[in-house]
């Protein structure tokens, strides 16, 4: 299994420059609105997922691998709930804290490794969300069981898996798709089985693969438009590697060979 520091190198570097205007321009071009997301999440998807989470003022939501914190802050504003975000990377947490200081939402963030047991007591959250990050965590049965542990009975879970196997992949495509670090690939049917085994009732599965293909295409195109500036920040090799990454993500999703699903579940009990 690849070392997790390989992932940290990509994401740590990315978060250090995350607040710069050049990356904000890319996000605006790709998503239409800059939520501060470092995932495939669109505003329309965020609003749908918030409805599935069914959180409101007085509830506590855990955002696992929350990245820059932008979507978490938006959820806190939309719902009035308290959001607790955890992320592995120090620069991500620093960016999150700047958002909190500037906007004063009901949100707080801490650095924690989501591949290990989370630093929270049992049944301490009303909902858990994880967007486009479960695929970076090894031992999915243990991860889902830990999310169930921190959820109260009846609590909601929403997570997206952007690398569900739904077609044939060759070694070159896999190498590019995993070039940013560790990935765990499972078929959609395995996610369903693991959700049930962890103590959840699956409520719905949403196929967001078409949206993924378009978002990846737009991100690559936006970066092409800003290539000169991005090459200065990233260097030529890193820039070209990321462009190959976005191109392969778009192609595999457009051909429905690697799909993105959103899972909505409720903890039994």
Where do the protein language model's features map onto the residues?
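Conserved alpha-helix/loop element of class I SAM-dependent methyltransferases that forms part
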Residues: 39-57
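Short, glycine-/aromatic-enriched active-site segment of Class I SAM-dependent methyltransferases
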Residues: 162-182
């Amino acid at each position: 299994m690849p070392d997790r520091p390989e992932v940290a190198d990509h994401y740590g570097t990315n978060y250090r420059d995350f607040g710069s205007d050049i990356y904000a321009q890319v996000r605006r071009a790709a998503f239409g609105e800059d939520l501060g997301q470092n995932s495939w999440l669109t505003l329309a998807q965020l609003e749908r997922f918030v409805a599935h989470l069914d959180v409101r003022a007085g509830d506590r939501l855990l955002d696992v691998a929350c990245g820059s914190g932008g979507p978490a802050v938006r959820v806190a504003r939309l719902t009035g709930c308290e959001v607790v975000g955890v992320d592995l990377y120090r620069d991500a947490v620093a960016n999150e804290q700047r958002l909190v200081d500037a906007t004063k939402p009901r949100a707080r963030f801490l650095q924690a490794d989501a591949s290990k047991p989370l630093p929270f007591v049992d049944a301490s959250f009303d909902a858990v969300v994880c967007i486009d990050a479960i695929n970076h965590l090894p031992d999915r049965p243990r991860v889902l069981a830990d999310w169930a542990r921190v959820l109260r009975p009846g609590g909601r879970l929403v997570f997206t898996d952007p690398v569900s196997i739904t077609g044939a992949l060759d070694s070159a495509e896999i190498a590019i798709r995993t070039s940013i670090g560790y990935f765990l690939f499972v078929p959609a049917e395995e996610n369903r089985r693991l959700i049930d085994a962890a103590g959840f009732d699956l409520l719905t599965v949403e196929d967001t693969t078409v949206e993924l293909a378009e978002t990846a295409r737009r991100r690559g195109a936006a970066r092409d438009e800003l290539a000169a500036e991005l090459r200065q920040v990233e260097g030529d090799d890193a820039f070209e590697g990321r462009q190959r990454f976005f191109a392969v993500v778009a192609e595999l999703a457009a051909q429905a060979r690697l799909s993105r699903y959103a899972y909505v579940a409720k903890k039994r009990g």
